[in-house]
């Protein structure tokens, strides 16, 4: 975590811009994490090789969220819960990609049911430019393309997701079996809670562009 990053965070927060920062807790000292949290930045653990102890130390320092559970973090084992197990067992917010490629339906369900507070789970699309655009793009010099519904590089490794939030919502209900009301909260309300923002409030006068209408099969319909 260099000085220029800290300065950028200060500038954004001084302008009252909501900021979430994903970091690897084993790479950033606890005092620095506390400093960032004190700025009003939401700090999330992710893209990490951290151990259980390092993940817990990050929580103690003020980390309040985990980025796309299971992905870009070591797998949980019977002797080393790691970041995954720490996230599931914590009261922190946890995001998860529900596209069937990043995480199997069964593993989504296990995490969802195991959380001590299920209203701390939220959906992440991890969508890339193929949603509404061409089926390929370049990222860090690599060609990324849609293959069998997944976004992959030439080696077949995942590189973002080819799904939007409505698709994640439908999968959570239809494939994982989460109740619709709970799934809607995970898509619309909990993300606002993560950032400390007011939850969406639908009512008379709500601008049409802020609304989505879905049919009984959770497919988007025109308003």
Label each PLM-derived region with a short phrase:
Residues 1-14:
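Conserved phosphate-binding/catalytic loop of the ribokinase/pfkB sugar-kinase fold
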Residues 12-16, 59-60:
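Acidic (Asp/Glu)-rich catalytic clusters
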Residues 14-16, 25-34, 38-41:
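Acidic, metal/ion-coordinating pockets
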Residues 27, 49-50, 187:
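Short beta->alpha linker loops
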Residues 32-36, 42-45, 50, 54-182, ...:
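Active-site-adjacent C-terminal substructures of enzyme catalytic domains
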Residues 184-193, 204-208:
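Small/polar glycine-rich anion-binding or flexible loop at a beta-alpha turn
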Residues 198-223:
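C-terminal cap of metal-dependent C-N hydrolases
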